[in-house]
Amino acid sequence: MSGMDNGWETSADAWIADMGEHGDFGRRYVLDPVMLPRALRQKPKKVLDVGCGEGRFCRMLRRQGLEVTGIDPTPALIAAARARDKAGNYARATAELLPFANEAFDLVVSYLSLIDIPDIQAAIPEMARVLRPGGSLLIANLNSFNTACVNTGWIKGSDGQRLYYPIDNYLQESATWIEYRGIRVINHHRPMSTYLRALLDAGLHLTFFDEPVPSTNAPAAKARGYGRVPWFLVMEWVKPA
């Protein structure tokens, strides 16, 4: 989430169309059913969504009566967020330098944005800094084995059946261009230990971890495929009081 060309500005229209109002399969059927209850659980008064994109999750939280600020470095996405939620609070900013006072928020959300942030060694301490003591950092992220396979995907047999999902260079951090459904952006791969060390070094305590399964109303074929290679994890980290 810096000034470098990461593809997000040119991919913004395709991204917005792909998300719609309800999100893609992973958000709608896997992550939202966990992320929304976790976000509401402690009745936070002030929430920051880091890497809010076009503002979909901000709108979900605002419909629940929360005071939400969304930040993103991509002008087109912030413009779309403001257009869809004229009463909302959205700002162009990077995760590595949050323009907020210390201890300003009860809850900070990173909803599939860590993979887009070039410098998490700067960003995670910033998220911890703006949390009040006792506040939570709620994270949805891609499993690191998934980002170690972004250029390969499923290996298929001659009949087109999915055989296995290979990973390579898992311990080597990298930034890779990925393309899907008209979107072309940079994703950052890091081993799980990189994220955990950064969160622990920021003084945060892990209080919740899940690899959520699709909800019962998810499309059956996609749910079966997800069960073979689950893409997502959810973590909640608390700043000690």
Predicted regions and their residues:
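A short acidic, Gly/Pro-enriched loop at the edge of an enzyme's catalytic core
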Residues: 96-107
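Acceptor-substrate binding/catalytic loop of class I
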Residues: 145-148, 179-193
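Conserved class I S-adenosyl-L-methionine
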Residues: 1-43, 56-60, 77-80, 136-174
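A short glycine-rich, Lys/Arg-flanked "PGG" loop and its adjoining helix->strand segment in the class I
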Residues: 121-133
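Class I SAM-dependent methyltransferase SAM/SAH-binding core
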Residues: 48-50, 54-97
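Short alpha-helix
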Residues: 187-209
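A short SAM/SAH-binding and catalytic strip from SAM-dependent methyltransferases
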Residues: 107-120
